[in-house]
């Protein structure tokens, strides 16, 4: 479980900085199901690439002046340059990227949608026809011609340009944030850093230190304000946080929707197992004691590829609208960082929509219409041209009832099985949380609410979790979603958008043929509960702490028991699974998510939202999710690593915003000007992976931000 934090558009510098902000589902006319990408749009080079170009130009000037000088390899500088150029061209040709300026210009012309029909070869038309026939049959394939293919490409280019223009305007408004001196002083990856090439280069940017080396006094606040620790078990104080967020928290760009966090939701998120009361920080007006700002952190164990560490998720950064000129947000960030350091945690994860130094992953929001009529009435989605409301509603109809044998709500007796299934499934991703059984019970069951007498549903329910149990009593699948409504700020007819957000899911189809997937992975597990025996050490970290080791010295030690840790053994990575496993996974996930949509409809949700993390790309199109105009960027505080694929690239223009794509371009440039075999191999691998449609493989990001 991850947190959201953020503020409205005009919140000062660091209001976005350390906030984990999933913005409210914004109104979007692009709610229609996505079309498969037919071509790769030309990619804009980023500022870092421009810097590289300048450096390369300088190198070329030097080479001209020293062309006659022979090196140890017997070649002149000019000959070496020519050799490297040929090698780069060979690499590009091998990867299907085009080998000459002519190839590049042809690609740009085709991708622009303005090309004449003659620019589209018969081979391209045949390839598209075969792809369409495989998905939609021969009738649809026969309709593919050069003329309508050119029109489709033009439409895709319009979508790409509109999306990039929207993102560009937002980025200009946020440029002051990214350039602010605050980030220059923080242990975060910078655009000017050398790219991470080897695994041993991944890790902490700054070392952990003992508490006595951490600042002991709170950071100073402007006059008339004072710090306060919020007790979330105190109903009055929790209500104050709720009121502050309700009136001042994240809105969409058009100020039409605002998240409406319930007290039950806040209780569920903020009281994560192992939470620290000192990480729930508020600012009051000294004279009136009115709460005017808040920030919080949630403890989690985070795994990034092969390394795991204790971290904090920064959430709910909010400053009262009337006080945003006081620059409270940067001070809030520094204070919550100080409090985390005092308790021995020196790493964090946070998300925002804007680009800061430096995203480790980026994903896009998708929305699945449930109540089509209401969404159209409030401006959340648009009815396609020349389509009636009745036809629009019919597009999103779902089956009358679920049809999945063994489906039922999750119960506490399922925690051990669900925990094991989740740990195995999440181990597939490059970046993911590590949940103990205790945490699984909290995130999936503690938000169930209380049963309503004589009625369906539960009072204060936040989470809905379901499992699929086979005839042998084994849980083969699980999925969950949570409720996060948004207030509608400009509608006379509707006051609330009842939104469900896709949470975690897992299925055992990815472990076909794995003889260990159905049995305990360790002999220390209790046969009845599946948890570690009480006679065994609880976890590496717990043992170290019990032995007197300080918390700051235990950041790399796991909270998982030996039994739980063994659940992650021998699991293939998401991008190395064979095609037949991906096919089975796609089929199963489409069935599970379709079932989830029916349940969401039956509980009166208007829309189901998600981002392109986990394996979501495998079902988005078939389940009629449409792309929104929001993007969620993931950031790691005090951790250096290669970017993580966030499921971007299926839609026009997404590649330009993807950190993985930018990293691949950067490494390709570097590979063309180096003899380092490691760099060349990594560049080739990155470029090849970047060309794969995420709808075929999913993503490497296993984090769901709440």
Swiss-Prot record:
Binding positions (tetradecanoyl-CoA): 180-183, 317-319, 325-329
Catalytic reaction equation(s): N-terminal glycyl-[protein] + tetradecanoyl-CoA = N-tetradecanoylglycyl-[protein] + CoA + H(+)
Gene Ontology annotations of biological process type: protein localization to membrane
Disulfide bonds: none
Family of this protein: Belongs to the NMT family.
Full protein name: Glycylpeptide N-tetradecanoyltransferase
Residue ranges, compositional bias (Basic residues): 78-95
Phylogenetic lineage: Eukaryota, Fungi, Dikarya, Basidiomycota, Ustilaginomycotina
Subunit structure: Monomer.
Protein species of origin: Mycosarcoma maydis
């Amino acid at each position: 479980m991850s947190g959201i934090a953020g503020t409205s558009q005009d919140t000062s510098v660091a209001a976005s900085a350390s906030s984990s902000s999933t913005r409210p589902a914004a109104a979007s006319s692009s709610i229609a199901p996505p079309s498969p990408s037919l071509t790769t749009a030309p990619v804009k080079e980023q500022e870092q690439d421009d810097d590289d170009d300048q450096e390369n130009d300088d190198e070329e000037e030097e080479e001209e002046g020293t062309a006659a000088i022979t090196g140890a390899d017997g070649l002149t500088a000019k000959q070496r340059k020519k050799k490297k150029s040929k090698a780069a061209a060979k690499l590009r040709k091998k990867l299907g990227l085009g080998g000459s300026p002519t190839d590049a210009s042809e690609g740009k012309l085709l991708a622009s949608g303005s090309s004449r029909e003659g620019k589209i070869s018969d081979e391209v038309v045949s390839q598209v026809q075969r792809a369409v026939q495989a998905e939609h049959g021969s009738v649809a394939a026969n309709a593919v011609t050069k003329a309508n293919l050119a029109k489709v490409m033009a439409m895709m280019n319009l979508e790409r340009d509109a999306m990039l223009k929207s993102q560009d305007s937002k980025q200009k408004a946020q440029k002051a944030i990214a350039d602010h001196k605050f980030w220059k002083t923080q242990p975060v990856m910078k655009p000017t850093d050398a790219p991470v090439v080897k695994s041993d280069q991944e890790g902490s940017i700054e070392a952990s230190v003992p508490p006595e080396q951490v600042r002991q006094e709170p950071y100073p606040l402007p006059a008339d304000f004072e710090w306060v620790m919020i007790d979330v078990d105190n109903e009055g104080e929790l209500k104050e946080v709720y009121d502050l967020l309700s009136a001042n928290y994240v809105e969409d760009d058009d100020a039409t929707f605002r998240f409406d966090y319930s007290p039950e939701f806040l209780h569920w998120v903020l009281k994560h197992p192992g939470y620290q009361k000192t990480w729930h920080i508020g600012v009051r007006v000294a004279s009136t004691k009115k709460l005017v700002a808040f920030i919080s952190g949630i403890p989690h164990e985070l795994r990034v590829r092969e390394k795991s560490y204790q971290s904090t998720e920064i959430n709910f950064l909010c400053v009262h609208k009337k006080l945003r000129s006081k620059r409270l947000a940067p001070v809030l960030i520094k204070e919550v960082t100080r409090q985390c350091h005092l308790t021995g945690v020196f790493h964090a994860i946070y998300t925002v929509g804007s680009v800061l130094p430096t995203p480790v992953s980026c994903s896009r929001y998708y929305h699945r219409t449930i109540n089509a009529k209401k969404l159209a009435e409030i401006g959340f989605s648009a009815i396609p041209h020349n389509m009636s409301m009745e036809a629009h509603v019919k597009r999103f109809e779902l089956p009358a009832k679920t049809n999945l044998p063994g489906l039922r709500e999750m119960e506490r007796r399922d925690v051990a099985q669900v925990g094991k299934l989740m740990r195995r499934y999440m181990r597939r991703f490059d970046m993911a949380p590590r949940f103990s059984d205790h945490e699984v019970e909290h995130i999936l069951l503690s938000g169930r609410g209380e049963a309503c007498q004589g009625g369906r549903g539960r009072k204060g329910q936040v989470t809905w979790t379901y499992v699929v149990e086979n005839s042998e009593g084994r849980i083969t699948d699980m999925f969950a979603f949570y409720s996060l409504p948004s207030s509608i700020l400009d509608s006379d007819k509707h006051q609330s958008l009842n939104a469900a957000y896709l949470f975690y899911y897992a299925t055992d189809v990815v472990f076909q043929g794995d003889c260990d997937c159905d049995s305990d992975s360790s002999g220390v597990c209790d046969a009845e509960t599946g948890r570690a025996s009480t006679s065994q050490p609880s976890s590496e970290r717990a043992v170290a702490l019990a032995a007197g080791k300080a918390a700051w010295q235990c950041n790399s030690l796991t909270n998982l028991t030996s039994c739980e840790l063994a659940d992650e053994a021998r699991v293939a990575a998401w991008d190395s699974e064979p095609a037949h496993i991906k096919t089975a996974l796609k089929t199963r996930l489409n069935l599970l998510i379709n079932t989830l949509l029916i349940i969401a409809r039956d509980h009166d949700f208007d829309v189901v939202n998600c981002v392109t993390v986990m394996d979501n790309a495998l079902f988005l199109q078939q389940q009629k999710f449409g792309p929104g105009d929001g993007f969620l960027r993931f950031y790691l505080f005090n951790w250096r690593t290669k970017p993580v694929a966030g499921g971007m690239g299926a839609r026009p223009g997404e590649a330009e915003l993807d950190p993985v794509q930018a990293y691949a371009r950067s490494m390709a440039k570097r590979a063309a000007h180096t003899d380092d075999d490691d760099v060349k191999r990594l560049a080739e691998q990155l470029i090849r992976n970047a060309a794969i449609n995420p709808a075929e493989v999913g993503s490497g990001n296993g984090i769901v931000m709440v």
